[in-house]
């Protein structure tokens, strides 16, 4: 069977060349006579893999020396607890609620102190990003938290909030490495890799060193302390070794594509193909305020639930899979991450045009 066009929100499409490289090395990684899956994480060979992955990520993002790169487990959901456990030293933090994942992070943080919801777009079903230029930031807040790209609702912070000097913590799971980023604008950014970088099971955090301290909330487990992972080079315990190996290959693929500036141009072009069609269509329409549209996740509807279901079924039969919208929203959603080729989006639009003509 030929490969389908996979529009899943995560786990998601990976570069085909990366999959081919991994397949070629599955039984024998560079003359070791074993797979990376079987390799001791304490071996020199694996140490070289994780060191190269970190070096390539630093090159891609321009990460300054005073930021640590941590490869961890637990996904973004575990970070909902780790962030307040490690950073909420005064037991106060401010959260901007622009979707399901920011809301979950905020609810988790309330278990550890005062988590203020300083702004929200819940009033319009998270279809826009609120003005964050002059927020009522708590003077005692240890950080301001956002989910930068909202996978479910298809919105994106195109301008970071004015945190009034407080460290910005950002969940970038679904826009990680989709465009250049000024790391110095963040105290911390993190993301589960299963959307835009690699297989599920790895979360990457980039944290300013002054935020990594022993001064954590009482009772914080050893494994949930950033300092534990920073002091041990992400090797305190057995890391998600194979997942990190795949991430490293994706970093090298991105470098070969020209880096994040080049991948942004490609992503802008892809998104334009789909958004231009949605804006002109008489049947399909987008659900997000135009200025806040994501380049990665594009939700759309017909306005008729039965017709939506018919479209999803027909699309799957035609080789366009995982287009069903999130269970909390309905409709459709096309996740067009870095590895989705432009031709995949164009062919989807061609299919949508045909479906519109026939319905």
Where are the regions that the model predicts?
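Active-site C-terminal subdomain of aminotransferase-like
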Residues: 15, 193-275, 289, 358-359
